[in-house]
Amino acid sequence: MHFLRRPISLRQRLILTIGAILLVFELISVFWLWHESTEQIQLFEQALRDNRNNDRHIMREIREAVASLIVPGVFMVSLTLFICYQAVRRITRPLAELQKELEARTADNLTPIAIHSATLEIEAVVSALNDLVSRLTSTLDNERLFTADVAHELRTPLAGVRLHLELLAKTHHIDVAPLVARLDQMMESVSQLLQLARAGQSFSSGNYQHVKLLEDVILPSYDELSTMLDQRQQTLLLPESAADITVQGDATLLRMLLRNLVENAHRYSPQGSNIMIKLQEDDGAVMAVEDEGPGIDESKCGELSKAFVRMDSRYGGIGLGLSIVSRITQLHHGQFFLQNRQETSGTRAWVRLKKDQYVANQI
């Protein structure tokens, strides 16, 4: 009984199934041939006993005998091929299920594949894939933890060095402004590295929440963003009478996304300019940030969303802002776009997120 419960290989299943089908239909064909041959022999014997040597009658009997063998033979071959096809399809069904499972997965879904099969090859493939996913998950988690730990540990000593420089400047009247500015840039870099590491940890378990973009993301960030823009006398304009849109995601990460978009616009826009946040609804939920800066080279949009790539080194930064935006957008299964504004100079950076279907259905 234990032997019967053991999984067998896909090759053995195919051979046994096709062999059984051919055997069954061969037996049916032999039985049919025996039955028809017996009937024809009896007819010929009857004709001989009755002295019916009519050639036309004999040829008709021969044609009937040939037809009685060919027609069932063609039918049997067609039926055999059809049943073999269905059998092979049934045996390879786990492969089709595995294909659908893999195609339906997102890049961040690293949970084990739950497909059970009594076929050795399928079990071996699923086991190998799950082992690969497990090792990949462990590697990514270790990388994120390492980045977060390093970034967190660097913030304290950098803040201490900055404090000592300020005390040194007050005590000895030394100009340490360039050093302080450089330290501020390093602290900003460390902060962005920490954000990027944390962004990759939030959705590992798939805990999505109902988030209203205006109420939960834009309005809570307004004071912080306005304070940042005041440094260059810039004005933050909120969506005008826009209806709120609900998405599935994490409000903290979406506020981080918005802050990085506004910070990028603030960095590359002239003093006294306006930076606008817009909301609109099409196939999904669109949140856009528009500025009045010089615009971008649209041929390099793909490069700008990569880590440590800057549009212009004169404006500072280390090029992680848009990489963080791209990463958070991916975690929300959305799309991130960069383009120049059509009606005037400036850049339009926007993300399209999936609307919350449950809330949409309730409406």
Swiss-Prot record:
Q: Which InterPro entries match?
A: HAMP_dom, HATPase_C_sf, His_kinase_dom, HisK_dim/P_dom, HisK_dim/P_sf, Sig_transdc_His_kin-like_C, TCS_sensor_his_kinase
Enumerate the catalysed reactions.
ATP + protein L-histidine = ADP + protein N-phospho-L-histidine
Recorded hits in SUPFAM superfamilies, A to Z, give: ATPase domain of HSP90 chaperone/DNA topoisomerase II/histidine kinase, Homodimeric domain of signal transducing histidine kinase
Q: A Pfam family in this protein?
A: HATPase_c
**Species name:** Escherichia coli (strain K12)
Task: Say which domain of life the source belongs to.
Answer: Bacteria
Q: Name where it mostly resides.
A: membrane
Induction of its expression: The eptA-basRS operon is positively autoregulated by BasR under high iron or aluminum concentration conditions.
Keyword annotations for this protein?
ATP-binding, Cell inner membrane, Cell membrane, Kinase, Membrane, Nucleotide-binding, Phosphoprotein, Transferase, Transmembrane, Transmembrane helix, Two-component regulatory system
Which sequence ranges are marked TM in the entry? 14-34, 65-88
Gene that specifies this protein:
basS
Q: An example of a Gene Ontology BP annotation on this entry?
A: phosphorelay signal transduction system
UniProt topology in membrane = Multi-pass membrane protein
The record's GO CC annotations read: plasma membrane
The name of this protein is Sensor protein BasS
As stated in the Swiss-Prot or TrEMBL entry, residues carrying the post-translational modification Phosphohistidine are 152
Cystine crosslinks: none
Spell out the post-translational modification annotation for this entry: Autophosphorylated.
List all topological domains (Periplasmic).
35-64
Function comment: Member of the two-component regulatory system BasS/BasR Autophosphorylates and activates BasR by phosphorylation.
Q: What is its EC number?
A: 2.7.13.3
What's its top-level EC category?
transferase
Q: Which residues lie on this side of the membrane: Cytoplasmic?
A: 1-13, 89-363
